[in-house]
Amino acid sequence: MPVPKKRTSISKKKIRKNFWKKKGYKAALKAFSLADSILTGTSKVIVL
């Protein structure tokens, strides 16, 4: 018989949300860094 799930605590929700935000921030930082290095010509990455 189905039973309602327990509610996720606010602190746990905030921790998960912050972790998710941090991953996005790091990805964006990496992308901007790569774009900057390509524009300045100091890139060591081969762009096709």
From Swiss-Prot:
GO terms for cellular component: chloroplast; large ribosomal subunit. InterPro entries: Ribosomal_bL32, Ribosomal_bL32_plant/cyanobact. The keyword Ribosomal protein applies. It is found in: Plastid, Chloroplast. Disulfide bonds: none annotated. HAMAP family: Ribosomal_bL32. PANTHER family: 50S RIBOSOMAL PROTEIN L32, CHLOROPLASTIC, LARGE RIBOSOMAL SUBUNIT PROTEIN BL32C. This is Large ribosomal subunit protein bL32c. The lineage of its organism: Eukaryota, Viridiplantae, Streptophyta, Embryophyta, Tracheophyta.
